[in-house]
Amino acid sequence: MTVEVVFSHSGSMFAYYLGIAEVLQEYDLSDVIFSGTSGGCFPCILLNSSNNIRDFFDEILEYVKNSNDSWENVIKNFLTEYLSDEDVEANQNKFICKLTKLNDFLLPEKVTVSSWRDKEDFINCVVAACYVPIMCGNKFYIEYRGEKIVDGFFSGTSNTPVTNNEHLLFHPNKWRYINPTWMLPSKDTVWLKSLYELGYNDALANIQDIQSVLKMNKEKELKTQNDSVRQSE
């Protein structure tokens, strides 16, 4: 049975989500559909494309450290360098990106996208899903596919599954109270590293929540069993 794994809005908590995603890499994700918005897009697209989560995180931190660009440009330029066409293909109909469309009266409407024409279209979609006016750039909205788009958070669906399947939701306050200021976009790489480790450790401490929905990858499970046998000997 297909499971939907949902990553909510995040701001700087994208680093926390990536820590969780490093743990999820140990599980069988072959029958999983991901949905997400804002920084919650990153773990979704990386887990679908089997990229190494920690390597991605280390590289984006290095990029952030050496860039004075807005978050809009950081995300766009870094993903353009990092992602391959194969990564985009791995996300076709396996990742549901949540966006907020501003209608003619600038009122928010929920929109989802799960297929893309090419790598450029894919990256533009993710950038739009992450766009918070003023905080991420100097525009009021992003133009995407001819529509006025902002972060999916503004349509109130970031915590809501898209499908009717069994789901596993990750949001900032799932396992602990998170001060709202932690969600503000930050380029403090030391702070972002601490959030990553916090997410990783919280996932391990609450592993039963994950194991109630996902099964460990068979290769990883066999390795764990073999390690246990060696320890008993």
Residue ranges of model-derived segments:
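Patatin-like phospholipase
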Residues: 1-35, 45-233
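Gly/Ala-rich beta-loop-alpha elbow adjacent to hydrolase catalytic centers
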Residues: 36, 40
